[in-house]
Amino acid sequence: MAKKSMIAKAARKPKFAVRGYTRCQICGRPHSVYKDFGICRVCLRKMANEGLIPGLKKASW
């Protein structure tokens, strides 16, 4: 879980545009965030397995 101070810091507009980065909207994780959903891979997998994201299911072949 991310610290509240880091989540607040990421929410502010950065002084320089290249310093901005995405965070997971659910847990605050800074890495491996999918832009389409706005959540990290860990939360995406958990929500997909529970069936909370329509049209997304586990692949099998």
Curated annotation (Swiss-Prot):
- Enumerate the SUPFAM superfamilies for this protein: Glucocorticoid receptor-like (DNA-binding domain)
* Pfam (any one): Ribosomal_S14
Q: Report the domain of life of the source organism.
A: Bacteria
Q: How does the cofactor bind to this protein, according to its record?
A: Binds 1 zinc ion per subunit.
List the record's Gene Ontology CC terms alphabetically: cytoplasm; small ribosomal subunit
A molecular function (GO) held by this record is: zinc ion binding
* Cofactor(s) required for function per UniProt: Zn(2+)
Q: Which GO terms describe its biological process?
A: translation
Q: Which PROSITE patterns match?
A: RIBOSOMAL_S14
Family annotation (InterPro entries): Ribosomal_uS14, Ribosomal_uS14_bact, Ribosomal_uS14_CS, Ribosomal_uS14_sf
Residues annotated as coiled-coil are none
What are the protein's UniProt keywords? Metal-binding, Ribonucleoprotein, Ribosomal protein, RNA-binding, rRNA-binding, Zinc
Q: Fetch the HAMAP family from UniProt.
A: Ribosomal_uS14_2_B
Subunit record text: Part of the 30S ribosomal subunit. Contacts proteins S3 and S10.
Cited function: Binds 16S rRNA, required for the assembly of 30S particles and may also be responsible for determining the conformation of the 16S rRNA at the A site.
What protein family is recorded?
Belongs to the universal ribosomal protein uS14 family. Zinc-binding uS14 subfamily.
- Protein name (record): Small ribosomal subunit protein uS14
Give the organism the record lists.
Campylobacter concisus (strain 13826)
Traced from the root, the source organism's taxonomic lineage reads: Bacteria, Pseudomonadati, Campylobacterota, Epsilonproteobacteria, Campylobacterales
